[in-house]
Each structure stands twice: as structure tokens, then as C-alpha cells.
Amino acid sequence: RSFAASAYSSIIYEGYDFSCVLIDATGQLVAQSGEDHPFHVIPVAWSVKGLLEKGTPIDDSLVYLHNDPYTGGTHLNDVAIVYPVFEAGELVFFIVLRAHWADIGGMTPGSLSGAAREILQEGLRFNHVPVPKSGIAPVMDLIFDNVRVTREAKADFHAAIGTCRVAERRLRAVLAKYGVATVQAAAAGVLAAAERRMRGAISTVPDGCYRFTSYLDGRDHDRFPLQVDVAL
């Protein structure tokens, strides 16, 4: 709600095209809002794991911008702010806000074109670009100079940073009340419970080989198949 109340773009304050999640220090999704979008939330863990796999030390003074579809993004307009939270010098959680930017550069206004033949035509790609938590940096000037609705982009970006600060404040209140170890144990318990339920559901499926085929929308001219084969 903080983001919807402070953003400038109608796609945010009317369309609610954004999601906010909490990720643990290993890159596991542990919490999300009931209003979040699955197509934002599901890839977020890969956005964070990609940052961790780089091996670069996570800096408490930085956030990391990510939208690369090859490493956990969706389409380029959906930009994730990966906001690390440290306690007593230890990385404990990541707050991640993924939101649709009205324009991210590229060949057409809005950065969405059926005529694009390569990703470079779709706009700017961010693969964990470090930015100070203030949101003020030369790299942001470069980014804003290469999108079409600069005023909205700046306002939405700073609204997103502010929302992450609100989330951090609320998270720190929980950590102060219950302790880091207890909160981390609770998060691990949620993941373990989810695994038990999923394994229980899978165990009811008879052993065998299963196949399902579907097709991408809008490809009637060649009907490119997407096939999944599963053996139990």
C-alpha cells in the first residue's frame, strides 16, 4: 500500500502492477502479500540467487536493480529492487520490490513491441546493478536519460526505495521483538512445512510417466509446442 500511495504511474497506483516479497539470506522466498502477482513472485528467488552466485560481497549500503529475463527476471519493464537487510553485521533477509516501469527504453514507447527480434530492441537490461540506498547515483542518471517518461520513472523509483525502507523498518521491529534466530527459524519452518505438504500431495499421484503439451499464445502460425515429461 505504501508504494501504491506514493508512485506516480497509473500502472502502479491503479493497476497494482507490482509485488513485494521477503527472501532469506540463501535466496529462498519466505513471505509475500496476498495481492502479489505469481509472474512477479515466482522468479524473484532466482533474481536474488543470481546476485548471491556472483560471489560479490553484499553491501549493506546498496540496493541491486534486476530485470534480466535470463537470470530470474520477467519482461524488461518489471524491475526488481533487491534490498539487503543486515543485523549486527550479518545478512539476514532481502526485501524485494518488483514493479512495472512504464518505459524501459528500446524501440517503441512503452518498450513492448511485437516487432522486436532481439532483446536489445526491448530496452535496458539490469543484471544486479548496484545503487546506493539513497537512490542517487550517476548510474541512475544514465538510466533515466534512456527511458521515455523520465519524470514518472524517477518518482516511481524513489517511491519504491521509500517502500523498501518502510518494509525494513517493520522487519526490524519484528526482529527486535522476537530475535533474529527465532524469526529465521520461523521462516525455515514455513519452508519445511511447505515441502512436507507438497511431498504429501505428490505421494498421492500414482507412479508412472506423465506428459503435457501446451502452446504459447499468439503463435498459431507455427504452434511451437512446450512439452513437459515427468516420471514418478
Locate the predicted segments by residue.
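Gly/Pro-rich turn-and-neighbor structural signature
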Residues: 4, 8-10, 16-66, 175-231
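Short, small/polar residue-rich loop motifs at catalytic or cofactor-binding pockets
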Residues: 14-17, 77-79
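A short, hydrophobic, proline-anchored segment that marks a local hinge/packing element in signaling
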Residues: 78-88, 96, 231
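Gly/Pro-rich active-site capping loops and adjacent beta-alpha segments
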Residues: 86, 90-146
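N-terminal leader/propeptide and maturation segments of large enzyme subunits in energy/redox metabolism
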Residues: 125-198
